[in-house]
């Protein structure tokens, strides 16, 4: 193989076909070997039984003859004994070595003596001493059967076995590949459909094949992934559009201030006023950039939580005191009730409560009340922040935690909001393993609920027990 070249891996169809062939070849080879050796053993046992039976018959004949002289007269009886057995050899030898009788296929023993014959592995033989007639003369009987027929049968069986195994393996490989190709056809169709998907066609969904179940599950999971991608892409598109819109307003204001300043000579107080107006826009941009950086770190799980035990009643009273001046200006009263111990990041906890509470104060009706209630719910510690004001439309409740989302009321005073406060709240809750929700009724009561897990935040967070909370809430 030349340097730089790579071996193309076999397709799943070919690999399964080869796998089927390998498994079948091992199975057939094992069964064939068992059948072959079983047949050989049975043939040997049959030949051994034949030799043993003929030996007993010869011994019986010899006992009936009249001594050594009577053996030739019984030639016809010995010939009948081996008739039909062309591979059978019978020898009767006197104790002095004289050959008294032999019959059968002498060619099998030609050029050999009895000792040599007994060493031939292809012959089945037995020998025994026999008594000739009533005079008590003894002789040696040797009966052997050639193994050529047995070898031919086993050879034919072996050839048939090898040929059948080879053909079976080849057919199995071909049939297995064909079946695999047919069963994987939905996968090829799925691949073609996936190749049609592009950024402009994220709404496209692949077909759900009725079978096989595995491909159907893949198609279902792929469609679910496409749905998530489409949702994420749409959110990213909205985020980009909203970001451009929200950055354009302060930048246009700054450009306008600069153009006004350069249009003619200004007095000192006029320049101070222009700089103060520009500073407001700079601060708004800074808040927006800070919020976006926090959300980016939260999305990438790049925020390490400093966990500490918090007494929620004390923390909420501290936050309500911070907003007391703004609440008094709007004739709003903030009440805190309930208490619990919570393990959370103190600064992020304050930031989440601050963002919700600032919205509650800003949108509360004059002479109304804001309730901060701590309660337990199963394995969660819940903080309810309820105010009375204009109800939030149902269609906006599902979008209220989205980035850059601002309702109609907020957009009437856009300089006071970046549209990222509640998105930051949701990110903080998710970092702690909790969630945030909002409900609004026609009676004007709007309740935001923050659910913190009682067992602390993510296990990967760094724990710092006893870390003091900040006296001043973190805004934004």
Swiss-Prot record:
Membrane-crossing ranges are 159-179
Reactions catalysed, semicolon-separated, are: ATP + protein L-histidine = ADP + protein N-phospho-L-histidine
Can the keyword Ubl conjugation be found in this entry's annotation? no
Where in the sequence is Phosphohistidine found? 245
GO cellular component term, pick one: plasma membrane
Q: What induces it?
A: By cadmium, lead, and zinc.
HAMP domain location is: 181-234
Specify whether DNA repair is a keyword of the entry. no
Its source organism is: Cupriavidus metallidurans (strain ATCC 43123 / DSM 2839 / NBRC 102507 / CH34)
**Gene from which the chain derives:** czcS
| Domain Histidine kinase, residue spans | 242-455
Give one GO term, molecular function aspect: ATP binding
Its name, as the record gives it, is Sensor protein CzcS
Q: Give the Cytoplasmic compartment stretches of this protein.
A: 180-476
């Amino acid at each position: 193989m030349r340097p730089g070249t790579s071996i193309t891996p076999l397709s799943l169809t070919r690999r399964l076909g080869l796998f089927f062939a390998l498994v079948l070849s091992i199975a057939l080879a094992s069964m064939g070997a068992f059948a072959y050796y079983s047949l050989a053993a049975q043939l040997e046992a049959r030949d051994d039984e034949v030799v043993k039976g003929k030996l007993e018959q010869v011994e019986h004949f010899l006992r009936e003859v009249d001594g050594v002289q009577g053996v030739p007269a019984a030639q016809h009886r010995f010939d009948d004994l081996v008739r039909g057995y062309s591979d059978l050899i019978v020898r009767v030898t006197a104790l002095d070595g004289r050959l008294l009788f032999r019959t059968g296929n002498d060619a099998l023993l030609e050029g050999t003596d009895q000792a040599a014959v007994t060493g031939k592995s292809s012959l089945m033989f037995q020998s025994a001493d026999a008594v000739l007639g009533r005079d008590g003369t003894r002789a040696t009987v040797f009966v052997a059967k050639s193994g050529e027929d047995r070898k031919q049968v086993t050879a034919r069986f072996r050839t048939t076995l090898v040929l059948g195994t080879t053909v079976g393996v080849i057919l199995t490989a071909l049939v297995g590949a064909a079946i695999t190709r047919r069963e994987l056809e939905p996968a090829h169709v799925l691949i073609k459909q996936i190749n049609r998907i592009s950024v402009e066609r994220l709404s496209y969904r692949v077909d759900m094949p009725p079978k096989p179940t595995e491909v159907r599950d893949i198609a279902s999971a792929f469609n679910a992934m496409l749905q998530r991608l489409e949702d994420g892409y749409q959110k990213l598109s909205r985020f980009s559009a909203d970001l451009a819109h929200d950055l354009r307003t302060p930048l246009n204001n700054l450009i306008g201030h600069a153009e006004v300043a350069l249009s003619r000579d200004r007095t000192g107080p006029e320049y101070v006023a222009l700089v103060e107006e520009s500073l407001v826009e700079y601060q708004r941009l800074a808040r927006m950039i800070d919020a976006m950086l926090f959300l980016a770190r939260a999305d990438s799980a790049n925020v390490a939580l400093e966990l500490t035990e918090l007494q929620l009643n004390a923390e909420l009273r501290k936050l309500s005191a911070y907003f007391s001046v703004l609440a008094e200006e709007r004739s709003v009263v903030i009440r805190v009730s309930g208490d619990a111990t919570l393990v959370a990041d103190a600064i992020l906890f304050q930031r989440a409560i601050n963002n919700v509470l600032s919205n509650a104060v800003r949108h509360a009706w004059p002479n109304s009340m804001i309730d901060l209630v701590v309660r337990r719910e199963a394995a969660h510690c819940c903080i309810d922040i309820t105010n009375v004001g204009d109800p939030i439309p149902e269609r906006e409740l599902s979008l209220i935690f989205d980035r850059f989302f601002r309702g109609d009321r907020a957009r009437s005073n856009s300089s006071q909001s970046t549209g990222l406060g509640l998105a930051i709240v949701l990110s903080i809750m998710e970092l702690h393993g909790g969630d945030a929700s909002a409900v609004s009724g026609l009676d004007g009561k709007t309740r935001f609920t923050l659910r913190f897990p009682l067992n602390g935040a993510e296990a990967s967070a760094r724990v710092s027990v006893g870390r003091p909370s900040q006296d001043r809430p973190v805004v934004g």
